[in-house]
């Protein structure tokens, strides 16, 4: 239907025009007032929830209810730092806050003043008047969330009393604290250690920081054994993230720890950890230093009955390392929607090692010595090796549903220098001759820089989409000096001195979607694409190494909780293990007069596919089964070549690894005794061939 309306206009008198103008002005002012009133009546509400000790309370459930119709207008949950955000809803409404163990709050929000008051909510522990009061603290249990394991309420654990975070991790399932240093998950290599979601430098510094943080200062510990598409595909060792408690406006807290390990030598260490919480500024920082000394001694005797010859081998070694480092992590809350962060970390290492090996040759049951060969190796850092890194990050909360944009810029720099002086001497009859005297001086400089941008969109509390891009570029300059003794100095051997420069870049994009289908089922699916390019230049021989790789890495996580007593999860991920520059340098490196290392510029990257199943029963029993399939594995092969021994790296085949862990935690005799035990089983099988030689290892 098409309707046409015709208007016939006539000139207006001045009085009528004046009256019309006044009406329009009044109409305009009324609209402005109504608009301002509606704007004031629909402001979003955000704030922080604290307990009686001014500590943040995570997991508080908040509901906004219409007081007239009892209609639920909006719901949300407080985050790990106690913050909550409600979307824009009309006034008035009743704000209800509930949490197990706390008295519920019902706050009427009628105007802007009420909204300002609700920006800080304080909840009190629920108290009942009983004839007899028995206070018990429920010990922490492992909780399963999509893609990770979480333990909260650390302070209630008997293992946390008087302990630091490093020692508390010894009682965590799936985690192994190695005696020689390092923390691993399910028998893998050392996991990446994060504090408050970020790296604090290398793992050695992170471990020292954990020794300085009291366990009761932890809000939660996250164990991520299988990383998803949002993480680098080269990270196959998992992540351990320690999240500290946040207490707004608490000011500065300082923790200091001194430790001493007594062996043949003394090995002291010290850690100072600082945490500052203000209205807009959060700062964590740490300083650590350690002096480690190690002494090794071994004796071996070999009798060759067929020839009647005998060999006596004596080995002595002393190692001294001085480590010092620190980091500062600063977060500034510009507003409720904008946060700026920065981090700087720095570490230094001074290294000394003296080793001596003596081989005595003679005959069985004879005191007569035919000859003695002695090898003395002195290794030291000519100057402290420095490592430093910087990070600048920005977070923009795009709405009140939890959507956000994260931007990270990173820079890392490392300098590593060693002087290795080797002296080989032969004692025969009455003569002593130095057969070889040479010096090796490897100098390696590394710089890596790049950034990452990620957008996380929350459609609602049950649907989240993550999309991200990252790009990193690195340069490694390996300058290897090999010199022969000439007087009081060493002169370069042109056939054994070399310089290798390796440049690479990695471009990645990923998408990840998480869905909560019901109270019993959650899923997460993602895919990551990486483009890797590298070029190495051997300056001595003019040889080049080129690598171009493009790979797709799918991931999938399923969490099924049929009841409060049963949790089942299945995680699948794919990863890649790329050879580092030292394995690709085509130049031969001589390590002794009779041994050398020949690298392989054609070494293939190894792709892996991992599947992990987990079952938790009654929060006290947890079974974890992890299976890993690796393709194109590589290893070092030691083979005799003429009168020399060659170490050669090559791909040889595929591998299967199975790790099973059963963890049991029980409180006995009314929580007077706490029983915790973990049993682990590991099986590895590899099969392949190198140079037509079949190899199988189980």
Where are these predicted regions, by residue range?
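Face-selective signature of the C-terminal outer-membrane beta-barrel domain
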Residues: 325-349, 379-538, 561-569, 623-625, ...
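N-terminal periplasmic accessory domains that precede
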Residues: 117-122, 165-168, 206-209, 223, ...
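Outer-membrane beta-barrel translocator/receptor signature
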Residues: 233-240, 248-299, 321-324
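Short acidic/polar hinge/loop motifs at secondary-structure boundaries
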Residues: 171, 198-225
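Outer-membrane beta-barrel signature, preferentially recognizing the C-terminal barrel domain
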Residues: 498-502, 576-629, 645-661, 666-667
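Short, acidic, small-residue-rich periplasmic hinge/interaction motif at the N-terminus
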Residues: 50, 63-65, 98-102, 115-158, ...
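Extracytoplasmic beta-strand/coil segments of soluble accessory domains associated
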Residues: 166-202
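Short, acidic Ser/Thr/Gly-rich low-complexity loop/linker segments typical of extracellular
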Residues: 67-83
């Amino acid at each position: 239907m098409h309707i046409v309306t015709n208007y016939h206009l006539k000139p207006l008198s001045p009085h009528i025009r004046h009256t019309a103008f006044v009406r329009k002005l009044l109409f305009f002012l009324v609209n402005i007032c109504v608009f301002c009133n509606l704007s004031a009546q629909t402001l979003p509400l955000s704030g922080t929830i604290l307990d009686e000790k001014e500590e943040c309370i995570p997991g508080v459930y908040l509901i906004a209810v219409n007081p007239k119709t009892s209609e639920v207008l909006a719901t949300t949950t407080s985050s790990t730092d106690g913050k909550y955000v409600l979307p824009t809803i009309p006034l008035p409404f009743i704000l209800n806050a509930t949490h197990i163990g706390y008295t519920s709050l019902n706050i009427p929000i009628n105007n802007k003043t009420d909204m300002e008051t609700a920006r800080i909510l304080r909840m009190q522990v629920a108290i009942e008047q009983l004839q007899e009061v028995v206070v018990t603290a429920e010990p922490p249990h492992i909780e399963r969330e999509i893609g990770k394991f979480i333990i909260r309420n650390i302070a209630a654990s008997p293992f946390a009393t008087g302990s630091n975070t490093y020692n508390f991790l010894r009682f965590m399932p799936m985690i192994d604290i190695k005696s020689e240093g390092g923390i691993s998950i399910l028998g893998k290599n050392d996991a990446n250690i994060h504090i408050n979601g970020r790296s604090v430098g290398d793992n050695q510094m992170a471990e020292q920081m954990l020794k300085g943080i009291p366990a009761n200062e932890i809000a939660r510990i996250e164990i991520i054994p299988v990383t998803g598409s949002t993480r680098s595909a080269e990270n196959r060792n998992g992540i351990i993230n320690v999240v500290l408690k946040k207490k707004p406006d608490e000011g500065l807290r300082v923790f200091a720890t001194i430790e001493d390990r007594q062996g043949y030598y003394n090995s002291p260490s010290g850690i100072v950890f600082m945490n500052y919480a203000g209205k807009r500024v959060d700062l964590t920082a740490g300083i650590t230093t350690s002096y480690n000394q190690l002494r090794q001694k071994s004796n071996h005797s070999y009798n060759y009955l067929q020839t009647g010859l005998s060999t006596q081998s004596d080995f002595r070694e002393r190692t001294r390392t001085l480590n010092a480092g620190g980091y500062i992590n600063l977060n500034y809350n510009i507003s409720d929607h904008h946060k700026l962060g920065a981090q700087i970390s720095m570490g230094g290492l001074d290294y000394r090692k003296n080793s001596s090996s003596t081989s005595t040759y003679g005959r069985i049951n004879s005191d007569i010595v035919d000859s003695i060969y002695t090898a003395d190796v002195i290794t030291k850092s000519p100057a402290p090796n420095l490592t430093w890194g910087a990070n600048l990050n920005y977070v923009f909360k795009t709405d009140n549903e939890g959507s956000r944009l994260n931007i990270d810029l990173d820079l890392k720099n490392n300098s590593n220098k060693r002087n290795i002086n080797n002296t080989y001497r032969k004692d025969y009859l009455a003569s002593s001759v130095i057969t070889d005297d040479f010096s090796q001086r490897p100098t390696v400089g590394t710089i890596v820089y790049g950034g990452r941008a990620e957008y996380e969109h929350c459609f609602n509390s049950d649907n989240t989409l993550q999309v991200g891009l990252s790009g990193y570029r690195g340069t490694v300059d390996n300058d290897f000096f090999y010199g022969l003794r000439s007087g009081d100095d060493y002169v370069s051997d042109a056939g054994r001195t070399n310089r290798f420069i390796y440049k690479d870049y990695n471009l990645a994009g990923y998408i990840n979607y998480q869905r909560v289908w019901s109270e019993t089922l959650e899923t997460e699916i993602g895919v990551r694409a990486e483009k890797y390019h590298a070029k190495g230049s051997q300056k001595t021989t003019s040889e080049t190494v080129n690598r171009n790789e493009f790979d797709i890495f799918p991931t999938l996580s399923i969490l099924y909780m049929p009841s409060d007593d049963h949790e089942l999860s299945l995680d699948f991920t794919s990863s890649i293990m790329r050879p580092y520059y030292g394995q690709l340098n085509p130049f031969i490196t001589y390590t002794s007069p009779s041994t050398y290392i020949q690298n392989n510029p054609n070494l293939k990257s190894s792709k892996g596919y991992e599947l992990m199943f987990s079952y938790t029963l009654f929060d006290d029993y947890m079974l974890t089964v992890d299976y890993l399939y690796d393709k194109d594995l590589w290893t070092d092969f030691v083979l005799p070549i003429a009168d020399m021994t060659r170490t050669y790296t090559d791909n040889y085949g595929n591998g299967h690894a199975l790790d099973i862990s059963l963890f049991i935690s029980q409180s006995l005799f009314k929580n007077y005794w706490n029983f915790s035990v973990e049993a682990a089983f590991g099986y590895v099988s590899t099969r392949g061939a190198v140079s037509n030689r079949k190899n199988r290892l189980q």
